């Protein structure tokens, strides 16, 4: 049984997050290990394993990039944990520009304003990539969708680094 089936959801990138959360709570209650405290040891073990499976499936499905990776793996394109580099030269150049810009933020006269502008720019590109990911997954174009996931991982990492940089400004 795959994660979508476990939660009674149609297999796809777009999903009903309310149904996901509601079903998660129901399954958590149904298979919580405490409910099996007086059951035979074998049933307790099954309950613990099932609870772990439910938690993992929920975390995977509620997180868009993890959901996309999982969906791609179900379709035969497993990119989870891969270290493949992108072949998209323009995106690679964009990465370099963003990295330089992040490094240059330290010398800005108004770092807070520069961070805000930079975050908006990256957020806009993130949104465009998410739209492309949604469309390519719906169309079954898994190779392009996999590239979108790779790009989104980079953008997410850059946003995390920007957040850490911003935090360091306030710690000084």
Swiss-Prot record:
Coiled coil: none annotated. The keyword Calcium does not apply. Pfam families: HSCB_C. SUPFAM superfamilies: Chaperone J-domain, HSC20 (HSCB), C-terminal oligomerisation domain. InterPro entries: DnaJ_domain, HscB, HscB_C_sf, HscB_oligo_C, J_dom_sf. It comes from the Bacteria. Residues 2-74 form the J domain. GO terms for biological process: [2Fe-2S] cluster assembly; protein complex oligomerization; protein folding. One of its GO terms (cellular component) is iron-sulfur cluster transfer complex. GO terms for molecular function: ATPase activator activity; protein-folding chaperone binding. CDD domains: DnaJ. Interacts with HscA and stimulates its ATPase activity. NCBIfam families: hscB (TIGR00714), PRK05014.1 (NF003449). Belongs to the HscB family. This is Co-chaperone protein HscB homolog.
